[in-house]
Swiss-Prot record:
GO terms for molecular function: thymidylate synthase activity. This is Thymidylate synthase. DUMP binds at R22, R180, S181, C182, D183, N191, H221, I222, Y223. It catalyses: dUMP + (6R)-5,10-methylene-5,6,7,8-tetrahydrofolate = 7,8-dihydrofolate + dTMP. The keyword Phosphoprotein does not apply. The gene is thyA. It holds the Pfam family Thymidylat_synt. The lineage of its organism: Bacteria, Pseudomonadati, Pseudomonadota, Gammaproteobacteria, Alteromonadales. Its EC number is 2.1.1.45. It is found in: Cytoplasm. Keywords: Cytoplasm, Methyltransferase, Nucleotide biosynthesis, Transferase.
Length: 283
């Protein structure tokens, strides 16, 4: 929690104003932030200075792992995070590649589970990684990427957290996640949960102990209409102790994640938090 608040304060104190063309808003911005989550010791990085809807964050990462590309599928899992970008993003609404209401296109897990090959085929990057790690293999390239510049026009939004690199040391699994852009007040509390859960789940289904997850953010920003509640409300609150995340130990395989896992398979213990803060969302 401290590293999250330190980043928020750093942006408020040291950030520079940048005009964002996509949203037509100004952002208070810093470059480069590195966060670390101790998954092995169950130090769950859930924000306590406001209520965080952790179930929605987990539903979103589950949707990525399943390769979903329709906002309705994400809603069925338990999150509405893609409703706006699928249905209110004017550039996507005007894109001839959009297939209709709720279509998100080729983004995130939909790309990672079927990464295009030059010969017209596809590679399931996630399945390859799971197969390798399950057999104790780390080829120094166990990378799940969602970033393909040639496919940007096929989706409603470029991936923000675009790469997850898994590494084995002995029987301990580590994760390095890279994020090109981060809406810190709204997005980071979700992204921290997702990086943590991704390592915890991947370690569990490949038979390894989870180690630490390293989360690099390149462009970290606070939108102009988010600055006041962040500076005057959230940063003025004292954080509570970190809660614990419990994952159903019956989740054993990638197929389990793809077929029957729901939010009921996750629970959080001892989550004490301040009141929610409604931050504006930039589409």
């Amino acid at each position: 929690m401290k590293q999250y608040l330190d980043l928020c304060k750093r942006i408020v104190d040291e950030g520079e104003w940048v005009n964002n063309a996509r949203t037509n808003k100004k952002c208070l911005t810093v470059i480069n932030a590195d966060l670390v989550y101790d998954v092995g010791n169950n130090q769950f990085p859930l924000v306590t200075t406001r209520k965080s809807f952790w179930k929605s964050a987990i539903a979103e990462i589950l949707g990525y792992l399943r390769g979903y590309q329709n906002a309705a599928d994400f809603r069925a899992l338990g999150t509405k995070t893609w409703d706006a970008n699928a249905n209110e993003n004017q550039a996507w609404l005007d894109n001839p590649n959009r297939k209709g209401p709720d279509d998100m296109g080729l983004i995130y897990g939909a790309l990672g589970r079927a990464f295009p090959k030059p010969d017209g085929g596809h590679v399931d990057l996630l399945q390859q990684i799971v197969d390798d790690l399950s057999n104790g293999i780390d080829n120094r390239g166990e990378i799940l990427t969602f970033y393909h510049p040639g496919a940007f026009d096929l989706g409603c939004l470029r991936p923000c957290m675009y790469e997850h690199h898994f590494s084995l040391l002995g029987d301990t699994l580590y994760l390095n996640s890279t994020q090109r852009s981060c809406d810190v007040p709204l997005g980071l509390n979700f992204n921290m949960v997702q990086v943590y859960v991704l390592l915890a789940l991947m370690a569990q289904i490949t038979g390894h102990k989870p180690g630490k997850a390293y989360h690099k953010i390149v462009n970290a920003h606070i939108y102009e209409d988010q600055l006041e509640p962040m500076r005057d409300v959230q940063l003025a609150r004292e954080p509570f102790a970190s809660p614990k995340l419990i994952i159903n130990p019956k989740i054993k395989t990638l197929k389990d994640i793809e077929t029957w896992v729901t939010l009921d398979d996750f629970s959080v213990e001892d989550y004490q938090h301040h009141d929610a803060i409604k931050y504006p969302f930039a589409v």
